Swiss-Prot record:
Bias (Basic residues) ranges: 791-800
Similarity annotation: Belongs to the ssRNA positive-strand viruses RNA-directed RNA polymerase family.
Keywords: Nucleotide-binding, Nucleotidyltransferase, RNA-directed RNA polymerase, Transferase, Viral RNA replication
Catalytic activity: RNA(n) + a ribonucleoside 5'-triphosphate = RNA(n+1) + diphosphate
Assembly and interaction partners: Interacts with replication protein 1a.
Domain called RdRp catalytic: residue spans: 459-574
Phylogenetic lineage: Viruses, Riboviria, Orthornavirae, Kitrinoviricota, Alsuviricetes
Protein name, UniProt field: RNA-directed RNA polymerase 2a
EC numbers, comma separated: 2.7.7.48
GO process annotations (BP): DNA-templated transcription; positive stranded viral RNA replication
Pfam family, one: RdRP_2
Protein function: RNA-dependent RNA polymerase which replicates the viral genome composed of 3 RNA segments, RNA1, RNA2 and RNA3.
Compositional bias (Polar residues): 774-790
Length: 800
């Protein structure tokens, strides 16, 4: 690039001189330009051919070539007077640079230039050369002739990023080179097999929390029925009245008027939205659960309009390059530890390690591989909509129909080759982050590993809610990610290929017959979605706030979610930049420790230490107890997922504190919730055993169409016998022998996981159902796990 610029300057200067001389006019600064370029050429030529060229010979060559009448001849060697030797070159006599040895050869047209060159270096008279030293030479600088020039070069301040070290210690472990699990692919894709330095946190971090819940007070009977409906009705008064089973039918059969940007529609595509309706289980409680959405052209078009089209244009005019440089500089200054960043080497060998991990975990078909990343069309995406909707946190379900989210994704062959690079980038980002920054992802970077002291001493919490985060991203966010990936050591050819393909991409939903294109916005669902959104979020926060301020104790970022904990309230004068500069519709909703739909609480462990506990948001959790999109085949997985999150509610203090936080989040202190805490206390009994979970969650009579007849005929009498038991006079069911036996058997089985009468007391890996299935008996009649029997599907419920 420097050579191109130099050639352009020479070209324009020559053109200017030619135009002037053609009219017989010499430019005013002609002599100055010649002096500068002549001196530059002499120095460059001498430095390039230092073995046989000196400044004297180069000057003779240049001056001789410039004279058309010059005839090359042997120049007599002149004796050098040491008095005139310059300070920096003992082999050149600057006082004898005239070329004209004969009187008939005139150099009158260059006398001024020669006079200038002859005095380019000067030692004052009366001073011997040997007495000159470094210090004495400086004393005579004022008497040395200055170089006349009209070019004034102003000293521009160069912003240097100082190095720092926050004291965070990360284990660097050397990993030897490993063999590829698919050598034919890794060789073709130019993935190198060599050793590398692993930057993961190893034995210094735990993969599971230490905290265990205390037993619920004896005043609460865990055998009482779980009924969260009063709490949901209290928080969302209109959710119970909404029956959305026929909402999609209205969308498909009624007239519709949509304003969308340019897209392609295949009108011959038709999807039956009634297919599979009779396979969905009917819940017992109406608490705002949403029905399954069938991918159709209209449903997909509604989702695309909201998630991808009609991009908001909120940015004002700004200098793109200046803002880009400031964003990257502030990110590296405020977010990254420069000492650890300087230790990062270019990626070499790490991509093969993560490539092998991807093959082991995902087991993609190797036939999907289409070639190296630079030869694959990364700008072609596939599209689909999510058939399961998120619970609604506002009481507007009766007036607004929720729109499903969209997923934009590459084929497996592309993901297979791009995921290893982004996994390397994520590990490197976690390595260089300062200690006050938390990115909850992976086994060794979870919320409970946060420093509880920072959370406990934080008095102010800044939660930032970005609306339309993915589709609002533009060129600025695109270029910021590009620069940050290069700073993390990702190969430049890969980064360039990836981001060039994201300047404009073509998306196609073949099942629904829709095609459209987008420019810089986030492709929700590709291999870089989470990491890219995290980088963008941290960049915005570092630009709007001074994250290096000691007032800020911690910063948590995960995708588009973020939380800042501080001692004093953060300044708000720059928060409008989120809209006017970064094009994000931004809300700052609550002064609460809340991130990723979880409340953060500081709890005390058994050994006296403290730990951060992430508690699910009850406003969403209670709505999941009345699902309308469950099928029999996923019922056991749904039960297992509830076991993994409801174990925290075995502690009465956690239930109380969570209820207070959720109450304030919903009503801002204007209303008290009477049933929320009791509903949270009763949640663990819901998953005490699978039998109780099925009985309290599923309406078997209404779900008869999707349950096998022989299983249903066994279930109904079994439930009827348990429901029609002897009750006391107050209407409270009396415990029977079957209840006690069933509870005892469930407790004995769960005691193996260190719990009694509860689903989980700590986070553990998913159960080994093969070992569990051998520890219980099987019932040939019902196939349902009761106090005596277990299912025939490796411990799962078999209703079909």
């Amino acid at each position: 690039m420097d050579l191109v610029i130099k050639n352009l300057i020479v070209y324009h200067l020559r053109r200017r001189i030619d135009i002037g001389t053609s009219f017989g006019i010499e430019p005013a600064d002609y002599i100055d330009w010649v002096k500068v370029f002549l001196l530059k050429f002499i120095i460059e030529h001498t430095a390039r051919f230092a073995d046989f060229a000196t400044i004297h010979t180069t000057m003779l060559l240049v001056l001789g070539e410039d004279d058309p009448n010059y005839v090359e001849k042997d120049t007599p060697i002149m004796e050098i007077d040491p008095f005139y030797l310059p300070y920096d070159d003992l082999d050149v006599d600057y006082t004898s640079l005239r070329v004209c040895g004969d009187e008939d050869q005139s150099c009158s047209d260059r006398d001024e230039l020669s006079d200038f060159i002859s005095n380019i270096s000067h030692i004052p008279e009366g001073t011997s050369w040997g007495s000159e030293s470094d210090t004495s030479f400086v004393e005579h600088l004022e008497t040395i002739q200055d170089i006349p020039t009209k070019c004034e070069i102003a000293d521009k301040p160069v912003e240097e990023i100082p190095f720092d070290d926050d004291g965070k210690v990360v284990n660097d472990v050397w990993v030897d080179a490993e063999l590829s699990n698919a050598p034919e692919i890794s060789c073709d894709a130019d993935i190198r097999a060599c050793g590398f330095v692993s930057l993961r946190l190893l034995e210094s971090s735990r993969g599971y929390p230490k905290w265990t819940p205390e037993r619920v007070s004896s005043g609460l009977n865990p055998d009482l029925p779980v009924n969260s409906k009063p709490a949901v009705d209290e928080i969302f008064p209109h959710h119970h009245s909404v029956d959305d089973r026929f909402f999609q039918e209205w969308v498909e059969t009624h007239d519709i008027d949509l304003e969308v940007t340019s897209c392609d529609l295949d009108m011959s595509t038709f999807n039956d939205w009634t297919k599979g309706v009779d396979t969905r289980l009917v819940p017992n409680m109406s608490v705002g659960g949403l029905s399954h959405r069938v991918p159709t052209q209209r449903e997909a078009l509604l989702a695309i309009k909201k998630r991808n089209m009609n991009v908001p244009e909120l940015q004002s005019n700004f200098d793109h390059d200046d803002v880009l440089n400031r964003c990257v500089t502030r990110f590296i200054t405020h977010v990254v530890d420069k000492t650890r960043l300087s230790k990062l080497n270019p990626i070499s060998g790490e991509e093969l390690h993560y490539f092998n991990q991807y093959l082991e975990n995902k087991n993609p078909p190797l036939s999907e591989y289409k070639g190296p990343v630079p030869l694959v069309a990364l700008d072609k995406y596939m599209h689909m909509i999510k058939t399961t909707l998120k619970p609604v946190e506002e009481d507007n379900l009766h007036i607004e129909r929720p729109i499903p989210a969209t997923i934009t994704y590459h084929k497996k062959g592309v993901v297979m080759m791009t995921s290893p690079y982004f996994l390397c980038a994520m590990v490197r980002l976690l390595y260089v982050l300062k200690s006050k920054f938390v990115v909850p992802t992976g086994k060794y970077h979870q919320i409970f590993q946060m420093n509880p002291e920072l959370l406990k001493h934080s008095k102010e919490f800044k939660e930032i809610d970005f609306s339309k985060f993915d589709k609002s991203q533009g060129r600025l966010h695109h270029d910021v990610q590009f620069r940050l990936f290069l700073a993390l050591g990702i190969p430049e050819h890969f980064v360039t290929t990836w981001f060039n393909s994201h300047e404009k991409s073509y998306i196609r939903d073949r099942d629904c017959g829709i095609g459209f294109s987008v420019d810089y916005q986030r492709r929700t669902g590709d291999a870089c979605t989470y990491l890219g959104n995290t980088l963008v979020t941290l960049s915005v926060l570092s630009y709007v706030y001074d994250l290096s301020n000691p007032n800020i104790l911690f910063v948590a970022a995960s995708g588009d979610d973020s939380l800042i904990g501080s001692i004093e309230p953060l300044p708000r004068e720059k928060e409008d930049l989120c809209v006017s500069l970064f094009n994000f519709e931004t809300k700052f909703p609550h002064n609460q420790p809340f991130i990723c739909s979880k409340f953060l609480l500081v709890v005390e462990c058994d050994d006296g230490s403290e730990e951060v506990l992430a508690v699910p948001n009850p406003l969403k959790l209670l709505q999941k107890l009345g699902p309308k999109n469950l099928q029999v085949t996923v019922l056991d997985d749904y039960y297992q997922s509830l076991c993994d999150i409801l174990w925290v509610f075995n502690d009465a203090d956690v239930c109380r504190r969570t209820a207070e936080l959720a109450e304030y989040r919903r009503f801002k202190g204007t209303k008290k919730c009477l049933f929320l805490e009791s509903a949270l206390l009763s949640l663990p009994s819901l998953v005490a055993n699978r039998m109780k979970f099925v009985r309290r969650t599923i309406n078997l009579e209404s779900s008869r169409a999707c349950i096998r007849n022989d299983v249903y005929s066994d279930l109904v009498p079994h439930f009827d016998s348990r429901v029609s038991r002897c009750d006391d006079s107050d209407g409270v069911r009396t415990s029977t022998f079957d209840d006690r036996k069933s509870s005892k058997h469930a407790s004995d089985k769960l005691r193996k996981t260190e719990c009694y009468g509860e689903a989980r007391c700590r986070i553990k890996p998913r159960r080994n159902r093969k070992s569990e299935s051998g520890a219980v008996q099987y019932s040939q009649s019902s196939g349902i796990e009761t106090g005596k029997a277990n299912s025939s599907r490796k411990g799962r419920i078999k209703l079909h």
